[in-house]
């Protein structure tokens, strides 16, 4: 039986050279380990790191350092701050939108008791399988103020669970 122990490192620079700085979340280093029994002399094993990345600046590069142990003795280590195969980049979710008339799809909404605007929201860097809610509010382009009907803002909301990190979803305003 073998144990893989890993630590997450922040790739930084000192004097123009890349250096490793241990990643800490809530004052604790981000570490993980996995125990496995190999079926062959060569193979792979996964080590899953779970941590809150909300406070990590987008664009930050994180590098995994790992050691292989058996019976408490270190047999091998991989600690290369420049290894692209051990590097991930923190990304932030992003959205862009495109609104259209809900009746005929053009950019003109006819004055009507039941006007509808559909906003197609293109999203990037979401977590597949996690539920998200998009909330929208129509604004007057000329004033920048929220559009109100009967004294209430015109809003739309859609809850969805993406299958992929990037995609599109629609929010309907009525």
Per-segment meaning from a language model:
Residues 1-174:
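Solvent-exposed loop/turn and edge beta-strand elements of beta-rich ligand-binding domains
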């Amino acid at each position: 039986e073998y144990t893989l122990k890993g630590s997450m490192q922040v790739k930084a620079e000192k004097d123009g050279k890349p250096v490793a700085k241990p990643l800490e979340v809530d004052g604790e280093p981000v570490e993980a380990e996995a125990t496995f029994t190999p079926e062959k002399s060569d193979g792979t094993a996964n080590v899953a790191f779970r941590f809150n990345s909300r406070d990590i600046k987008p664009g930050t590069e994180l590098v995994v350092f790992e050691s292989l142990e058996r019976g408490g003795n270190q047999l091998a280590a991989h600690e290369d701050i420049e290894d692209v195969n051990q590097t991930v980049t923190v990304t932030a979710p992003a959205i862009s939108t495109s609104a259209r008339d809900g009746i005929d799809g053009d950019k003109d909404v006819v004055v009507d008791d039941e006007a509808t605007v559909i906003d197609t929201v293109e999203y990037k860097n979401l977590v597949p399988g996690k539920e998200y809610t998009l909330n929208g509010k129509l604004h007057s382009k000329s004033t920048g103020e929220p559009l109100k009907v009967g004294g209430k803002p015109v809003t739309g909301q859609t809850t969805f669970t993406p299958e992929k990190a990037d995609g599109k979803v629609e929010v309907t305003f009525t």
